[in-house]
From Swiss-Prot:
Record lineage: Bacteria, Pseudomonadati, Pseudomonadota, Gammaproteobacteria, Pseudomonadales
Coiled-coil regions, chain positions: none
Species annotation: Pseudomonas syringae pv. syringae (strain B728a)
Active site: Y128
The EC number(s) this enzyme carries: 3.1.15.-
Signal peptide: none
Gene field: orn
UniProt name for this protein: Oligoribonuclease
Length: 178
């Protein structure tokens, strides 16, 4: 059910960091309520890319995405960038009215840059504001360096979103005092 207070969490895995030369290879979404309770998990989509495109990945991306199995999932996928955008938009429309939720995640500006370049209809669904958990991470590192949130590092989209939500819960409990 749509609610203006629901939050859209998104994570992308890409072939690199430049939206003009790199592409999205995986995306996932989660909807939470304003208290960070998960309401629904959206589709986890490996976006098909050609072998030629995948061969352009740098060493880190080649190793990381190859080791996680993502590169193989991308090769085997039949889902185009446009289809991935449409499936994700169809899911979030069930939960959040247009332009009411900030885009939520870790280092979310990077994801937003890729959405703007490759999935503009989806990017336009979000409010112009960002809810970036990495802002709190940076502030905690400077103002309360004893606070440490332990993260995994699968670099798979759904795992990364779950970690981002857990990390925001951690900062809410230990860093943001009522």
């Amino acid at each position: 059910m749509q609610n203006k207070q629901n939050l859209i969490w998104i994570d992308l895995e890409m072939t690199g960091l430049d939206p003009d030369t790199d592409v999205i290879i995986e995306m996932a979404t989660i909807i939470t309520d304003s208290e960070l309770n998960t309401l629904a998990e959206g589709p986890v989509i490996a976006v098909h890319q050609s072998d030629e495109t995948l061969a352009k990945m740098d060493e880190w991306n080649t190793r990381q995405h190859g080791g996680s199995g993502l590169t193989q999932r991308v090769r085997e996928s039949t889902v185009s960038m446009a289809e991935a955008e449409a499936q994700t938009l169809e899911f979030i429309k069930l939960w959040v009215p247009e332009r009411s939720s900030p885009i939520c995640g870790n280092s979310i500006c990077q994801d937003r840059r890729f959405l703007y370049r490759h999935m503009p209809t989806l990017e336009n669904w979000f409010h112009y504001r960002n809810l970036d958990v990495s802002t709190l991470k940076e502030l905690a590192a400077r103002w309360s360096p004893e606070l440490k949130f332990k993260k995994g590092s699968t670099h798979l989209a759904l795992d990364d979103i779950r970690e981002s939500i857990a990390e925001l819960r951690f900062y809410r409990e230990h860093f943001i005092k009522p």
